[in-house]
Amino acid sequence: MPKNATIHTSSGFMGNPVALTHCKPKEIIVRKRFSGSTIMVAIAAAAGSVVISAPTTTASAQAPAASGTTPAPAPSLKTAWGEPDLQGIWTDETATPLQRPARFANQEFFTEAERAELDRMRSEVLGRERRAERGTERDVSGSYNNVFVSFKRTGARTSLIADPPNGRIPPLTPEAQKIAGAEREFRLALLQSTETCKNKEAACSGGKYDPTHSPRFAELPPRYSTARMNRNDGPEDSSLPERCLTGGLPEFGGPTGSFRRIVQTPGGISIFYDVGQGQGWQRNIVMNASPHLPANIRQWYGDSRGRWEGNTLVIDVTNFSPKTDFQGSRENLHLVERWTRTGPSTLEYEVTVEDPTVWARPWTVKEEFARQSDQDNRLYTEPRCVEGNYGLPGIIHGRRMEERAFAEGRGPDPATRDAMKDGFIFDDEPLR
């Protein structure tokens, strides 16, 4: 291998893995495939994972108190080897948008009336017993009835972003704007002959309708594609979520789940992320004070190096693969995470996001997680993604069938049909 060769790995760690397995829901549910949707829903049954790890409490703390005796002491917030104990299954129990919606400007907290109204608005979409736009492709693409899906109550804060004070992602650098503009222009060109642009829907914002499909259909994307496009020539035209490659950092939850299982051993920490739809992934944090990997070694989840600052776990993450994509940031993404146990059932997470090639300044997100029951999450299975294993060949085969039908005069030109299924929105992120 050449000395300066770049190595890309899909593993979240370098070294010996810690076995982690995915948790089945407590109840039987139907998980909807959201294909880029920004609506955040909470599955009614908790989900997580299980591992075999060192105990964190003494036998006396675990045993129930006998009648008439002094109650057993509360579990310690330290591990058996003396480190702050962050272990358990954790989730955020309320819905908070990443960015503050423009209509709430510099308002840091919702009023109770605003929270109630936002809950009402989401309840009209999720949990309903009717389907919208019957007979349309959009209806077929969202074939699960929303009655099977629940939603989380609106949180008190108007954004997860705590800094800048306006709760918004900082402006892009001029170079990042240029790159984003080129990608957007390419995807809009592939949409121009669809009903989406003809009807001037939000997904075509900034584009225009033209009944003839764009000659750019024959072009490669401006750079490695991570988002959905209106073309299915091959697997590379499908988005990362469609290919079950959504796992990545930072992770702020998604449409079908936001659970973390933290496991500690002397000298090591692993975090398993359950993101719903049968998908999950893990990362291992190196705790031996060693430096980051060489710059030519790149990993999907980056290279995590942790240390303790008092009761806070501080993790520095670098060495991301250029094939990942977080808000336009790829190989230059740098994260500093802070995990702090704030009580027996509460955990605070803070992450500062930095990429000087993408944003004008660093920005910080804060989240609060609640401890979930290990007993209720005792059934487990390996995470898997049916869409990634079986759906993609069907999507590509279906496109070839549509093309043959069009050539034989039996159907419309596939280029005039929006295959993106609502997955392309440019305006403010709605409340999830």
Stretches with model-predicted labels:
Residues 27, 31-43, 47-432:
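PEST-like low-complexity, intrinsically disordered acidic/proline/serine-rich tracts
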Residues 10-29:
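Short, Lys/Arg-enriched N-terminal segments with co-localized hydrophobic residues
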Residues 2-7:
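Extreme N-terminal basic, low-complexity initiation segments
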